[in-house]
Amino acid sequence: MSRKPIIAGNWKMNKNPQEAKAFVEAVVSKLPSNDLVDVAVAAPAVDLVTTIEAAKDSVLKVAAQNCYFENSGAYTGETSPKVLADMGADYVVIGHSERRDYFHETDEDINKKAKAIFANGLTPIICCGESLETYEAGQAVAFVGAQVSAALEGLSAEQVASLVLAYEPIWAIGTGKSATQEDAQSMCKAVRDVVAADFGQEVADKVRVQYGGSVKPENIKEYMACPDVDGALVGGASLEADSFLALLDFVN
């Protein structure tokens, strides 16, 4: 079946509110119509209000880069999914390898966050991916499959069909070393196969699977030609308006 592609820029810990506003103003008038592709930017928490306001009345969607799994309480430094929904966010990125690595987030944490995100009417973009050591040992499919199964545990079929999974091999994030087209296709298909095993083929045919890891305007077309790649989660190439817009040229 035909799945609408989704291109999401992950700014990580970059841009102040003024820079975020300038970026959004530079891109919104040049975006393709959202019948062809969904386009989002994941802004740092300090930029979300500005980014959401600047993107209002455009096809650009806004994602948070993380949230907690409780709506309120004594959780100093955390971000409430309920407040994100109240602010007008659309997506929340969870499970990024940088969160797993630097902040010791577990599969259980990510599963709780996914449930909290859905409970507040938002859509999770759930990241998964293996280290170079795991990849070279031939264990990537098993490792990533376990991440996906754990993240989706207890969700409904309808919820899983509507979310986004982002396969990002850790060895390709910000390294300039990107997966081959064949690797991206085989791993995104493996992610979809896990969904099929856990929730059925109909759900697997609907869920969107992104590839991420040193995606840029020069290589996005080859990834988007893969039957099981439904978009990209993009870091460095999403920081400048021109390169971000160039990522969308595959639509034409």
From Swiss-Prot:
State the GO CC annotations: cytosol
UniProt-annotated binding residues for substrate: 10-12, 174, 214, 235-236
Q: In which pathway does it act?
A: Carbohydrate biosynthesis; gluconeogenesis; Carbohydrate degradation; glycolysis; D-glyceraldehyde 3-phosphate from glycerone phosphate: step 1/1
The family database entries (Pfam families) matched by this protein are listed as: TIM
The yes or no answer to whether the keyword Isomerase is present is yes
Alphabetically, the GO molecular function entries are: triose-phosphate isomerase activity
Which reaction does this enzyme catalyse, per its entry?
D-glyceraldehyde 3-phosphate = dihydroxyacetone phosphate
Record carries keyword Transferase: no
Q: Which residues form the active site?
A: 96 (electrophile), 168 (proton acceptor)
One BP term from GO: glyceraldehyde-3-phosphate biosynthetic process
**Places the protein is found:** Cytoplasm
Sorted UniProt keywords: Cytoplasm, Gluconeogenesis, Glycolysis, Isomerase
Point out the coiled-coil segments of this chain: none
Entry's EC annotation? 5.3.1.1
Q: Give a short account of what the protein does.
A: Involved in the gluconeogenesis. Catalyzes stereospecifically the conversion of dihydroxyacetone phosphate (DHAP) to D-glyceraldehyde-3-phosphate (G3P).
Q: Which family does it belong to?
A: Belongs to the triosephosphate isomerase family.
HAMAP family noted in UniProt: TIM_B (MF_00147_B)
Question: Assembly and partners?
Answer: Homodimer.
Q: In its UniProt entry, what is this protein called?
A: Triosephosphate isomerase
Q: What species is given as this protein's source?
A: Streptococcus equi subsp. zooepidemicus (strain MGCS10565)
Tell me what gene encodes this: tpiA
